[in-house]
């Protein structure tokens, strides 16, 4: 299966081969707290797929979990919007920050991924504008380093923010105080050993990928 189903695409109340998606995301958050700890006052998730991982981080670290974002239910997922401009505008329309929840606090922001960096820098800025004194970003998946050829809109490597950048450089680009990713070795653990495709993280695909990009340019 595509590990992105458990991380992002699937509903939290669904199961994949008997393994609950909600449980997998909670576990990812726990692993993040173990492997990438930081002192803070509040853990928040970027809705919706970041919420369970944020709860897991809170349970493992003992840092309180809270709600920082109000989501506009009429806006779809920004990751699968067809163009860069539509992704950027959707972020601003999709989320509002609860200022009273984050003002004066050191915030850990949990999200499911950083692909192009379109949403992360804007959400970090929203938290700072709302009064957060620090914003520490934790991602419940490894860095995206390779494209997907099998159905997910993960573009050529040059469009991926992690391509040819260190974690510190990505942290600077998105404007966070610190940045941590889930380790690649944790992916199998979070889904209890189910066979998974993690080619977008490792470059190792379950079948030989095409030698050229056959997806075309859908952003024109």
Write out the residue ranges for each language-model feature.
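PRPP-associated nucleotide enzymes
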Residues: 4-220
């Amino acid at each position: 299966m595509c590990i992105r189903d458990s991380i992002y695409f699937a509903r939290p109340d669904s199961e994949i081969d008997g393994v609950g998606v909600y449980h997998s995301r909670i576990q990812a958050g726990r692993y993040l707290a173990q492997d990438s700890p930081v002192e803070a006052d509040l853990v928040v998730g970027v809705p919706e797929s970041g919420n369970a991982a944020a709860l897991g981080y809170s349970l493992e670290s003992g840092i309180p979990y809270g709600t920082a974002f109000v989501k506009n239910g009429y806006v779809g997922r920004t990751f699968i919007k067809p163009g860069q401009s539509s992704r950027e505008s959707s972020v601003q329309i999709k989320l509002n920050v609860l200022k009273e929840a984050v003002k004066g606090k050191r915030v850990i922001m949990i999200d499911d991924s950083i692909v192009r960096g379109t949403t992360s820098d804007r959400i970090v800025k929203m938290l700072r504008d709302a009064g957060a004194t620090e914003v520490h970003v934790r991602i419940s998946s490894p860095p995206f380093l390779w494209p997907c050829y099998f159905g997910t809109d993960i573009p050529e490597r040059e469009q991926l923010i992690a391509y040819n950048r260190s974690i510190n450089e990505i942290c600077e680009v998105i404007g966070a105080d610190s940045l941590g990713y889930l380790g690649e070795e944790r992916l199998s653990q979070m889904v209890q050993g189910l066979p998974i495709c993690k080619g977008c993280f490792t470059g190792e695909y379950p079948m030989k990928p095409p030698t050229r990009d056959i997806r075309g340019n859908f952003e024109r």
